[in-house]
Amino acid sequence: MTEKHLLKDMTWVEFRERLAENPVILLPFGSQEEQGPMAPMGDWMLTEAIADRIAREAGAIAAPTMPFGYADYFRPIPGGIAFRPDTFRRVLEDICENFLNHGLDHLVVFNGHSGNFPLVDQTIRKIKEERGVLIPCLNVWRLMTAKEWEAFHPQGMKAFGHGGDPLTSVYLHLFPELMRMDLAEPSPEPGTLLDLPTAGLNAVKFQGVDINLAVDVTDRAANGVAGGDPTQSAAEIGEKMTNFIVEFTVDFIRHFKTVETRTHKK
C-alpha cells in the first residue's frame, strides 16, 4: 500500500508508526481573503494543493491547512475571515506544541499568506527560546527570485502584486473552473491617504520614501487588485511557478531532514 502523506488521511496507529523516523511535518497556512474580482477568496486552497504534492514527493507529512490568517487590511471587503494577531500566534504555537510534545522536531511552516509572516516569526522565536527547537518558515509566494520571474512571466517582477501574480496564474493552473477571468481588470492607479499615494498595503510615498501607515486594500485599490495585471496571467505561467515552488521546497525538506533542529532541551 502506498504510504500516506496527509495527516488527515492517516489513522493514529499509522502516524505512530512514523514517529520513529521523525518525519518532516509540513504546516501549511493560508488565508480567506479577497484576491481581486476574478479569483476565489480561499487562497489557502493553493497552499493546500501545493503542500500535498510536496509532502508526497519529499516523503514528508502535511498537516491540515490552516485556512485563516492575519489580514486586517482586507476587512473592508466582505467574505474574508481573519484572526486577531494574538489568536494567530496562539494557534500556530498550539499546533507546533502538539507535534513537539511527541518528540517531532522537524517542523516547517509553509506560509501562503505574506501578512502572516511577522506573527510566524514572533512565534517561532518564542518556541526557539522556550523549547530549544528551530522551526523554519517558507513564504510560498516569496520563494521565486527575480531570476525565476523573468524566466516564467513576460512582465517579470512587474507582474507581482496582490490580485495579480503569482496567485492568479497559479489559480488558473490548479483551479481554472473557479476563476472568473471575465471580471479581471488591472490594478488601478494608487489611491491616496494624507494626500499622498499609497504604496502597497502598509505605506504611502513621500518624496520617493515609504512612510508606514495603516493602509486598507480599498485605500489602495477599490477593485482589490493592489498590484500587477491579472489580465496577463495564464495557466502556463502558473504551472511553471508551481513546479518551481514544489521543486525548491522538496530540495529544502531533503536538506532539513539531515540537520539537527534542537539548540537545547527543556
Predicted feature locations:
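Extended, histidine- and acidic-residue-enriched regions that form the cofactor-binding/catalytic faces
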Residues: 1-106, 114-266
